């Protein structure tokens, strides 16, 4: 049994926090994932604590830091870390096999500028990240909760937008991506109303996929089938 924080939101986008204790039905780790957790966690893992992180101490240097929420199996995150050795990267994922997979790929790639949390992202952002310390926050392909009655479960809500804003430096960017058009419209509605942000799109809506976000195999297949992907980037200006 594990205590896992799950977030729901009311009509105003306020957190309705619930802590539930339940068996995580996430499947067993593969042998490779388990080995990576054992061998690489001491090197790249960050144990959650409600104390602010000292990023310079964690990475052994001063550098702009990018944080990704929900990195899945970690392939894209590792690719970004390898392509930008001048940046520090932090990933957050609640799915343990995904954390194990990410650590395995990171070790194979030889990246040294990546650290990961196996924890709830909102708790990490609120308690472990020093305010105004991040250069970019990434939220790629979050659960769309496509049924209308489930929209309150979508992570992109007004209070969440302010949590992200508090973590970003002035000039820092919140980068979102989704393959659900309705969710992209929801994201834009929330972010356009959020104080302290400016849309980086010259047309006031979405942007072209920037070079720093790798094209996933799933996304490439979607393009071939005519499916859309929407990238949204908002800069903290206040």
Curated annotation (Swiss-Prot):
<feature type="binding site">
    <location>
        <begin position="216"/>
        <end position="219"/>
    </location>
    <ligand>
        <name>substrate</name>
    </ligand>
</feature>
<dbReference type="GO" id="GO:0008176">
    <property type="term" value="F:tRNA (guanine(46)-N7)-methyltransferase activity"/>
</dbReference>
<feature type="binding site">
    <location>
        <position position="68"/>
    </location>
    <ligand>
        <name>S-adenosyl-L-methionine</name>
    </ligand>
</feature>
<dbReference type="Pfam" id="PF02390">
    <property type="entry name" value="Methyltransf_4"/>
</dbReference>
<keyword id="KW-0808">Transferase</keyword>
<feature type="active site">
    <location>
        <position position="143"/>
    </location>
</feature>
<feature type="binding site">
    <location>
        <position position="93"/>
    </location>
    <ligand>
        <name>S-adenosyl-L-methionine</name>
    </ligand>
</feature>
<keyword id="KW-0949">S-adenosyl-L-methionine</keyword>
<dbReference type="InterPro" id="IPR003358">
    <property type="entry name" value="tRNA_(Gua-N-7)_MeTrfase_Trmb"/>
</dbReference>
<keyword id="KW-0819">tRNA processing</keyword>
<feature type="binding site">
    <location>
        <position position="120"/>
    </location>
    <ligand>
        <name>S-adenosyl-L-methionine</name>
    </ligand>
</feature>
<keyword id="KW-0489">Methyltransferase</keyword>
<dbReference type="InterPro" id="IPR029063">
    <property type="entry name" value="SAM-dependent_MTases_sf"/>
</dbReference>
<comment type="similarity">
    <text>Belongs to the class I-like SAM-binding methyltransferase superfamily. TrmB family.</text>
</comment>
<feature type="binding site">
    <location>
        <position position="147"/>
    </location>
    <ligand>
        <name>substrate</name>
    </ligand>
</feature>
<feature type="binding site">
    <location>
        <position position="143"/>
    </location>
    <ligand>
        <name>S-adenosyl-L-methionine</name>
    </ligand>
</feature>
<comment type="pathway">
    <text>tRNA modification; N(7)-methylguanine-tRNA biosynthesis.</text>
</comment>
<dbReference type="InterPro" id="IPR055361">
    <property type="entry name" value="tRNA_methyltr_TrmB_bact"/>
</dbReference>
<feature type="binding site">
    <location>
        <position position="179"/>
    </location>
    <ligand>
        <name>substrate</name>
    </ligand>
</feature>
<comment type="function">
    <text>Catalyzes the formation of N(7)-methylguanine at position 46 (m7G46) in tRNA.</text>
</comment>
<protein>
    <recommendedName>
        <fullName>tRNA (guanine-N(7)-)-methyltransferase</fullName>
        <ecNumber>2.1.1.33</ecNumber>
    </recommendedName>
</protein>
<dbReference type="GO" id="GO:0043527">
    <property type="term" value="C:tRNA methyltransferase complex"/>
</dbReference>
């Amino acid at each position: 049994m594990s205590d896992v924080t799950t977030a729901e939101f009311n009509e105003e986008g306020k957190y309705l926090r619930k802590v539930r204790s339940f068996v995580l039905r996430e499947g067993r780790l593969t042998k490779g994932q388990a080995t990576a957790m054992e061998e690489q966690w001491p090197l790249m893992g960050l144990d959650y604590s409600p104390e602010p992180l000292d990023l310079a101490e964690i990475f052994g240097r001063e550098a702009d830091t990018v944080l990704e929420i929900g990195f899945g199996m970690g392939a894209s995150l590792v690719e970004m870390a390898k392509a930008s050795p001048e940046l520090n990267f932090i990933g957050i994922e609640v799915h343990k096999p995904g954390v194990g997979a990410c650590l395995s790929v990171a070790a194979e790639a030889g990246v040294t500028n990546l650290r990961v949390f196996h924890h709830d992202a909102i708790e990490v952002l609120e308690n472990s990240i020093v305010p105004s310390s991040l250069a970019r926050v990434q939220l790629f392909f979050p659960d769309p909760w496509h049924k209308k009655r489930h929209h309150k479960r979508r992570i992109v809500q007004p209070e969440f937008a302010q949590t992200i804003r508090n973590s970003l430096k002035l000039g820092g960017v919140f980068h979102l991506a989704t393959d659900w058009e309705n969710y992209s419209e929801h994201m834009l509605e929330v972010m356009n109303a959020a104080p302290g942000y400016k849309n980086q799109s010259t047309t006031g809506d979405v942007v072209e996929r920037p070079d720093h976000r790798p094209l996933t195999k799933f996304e490439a297949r979607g393009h071939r089938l005519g499916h859309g992907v929407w990238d949204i980037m908002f800069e903290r200006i206040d």
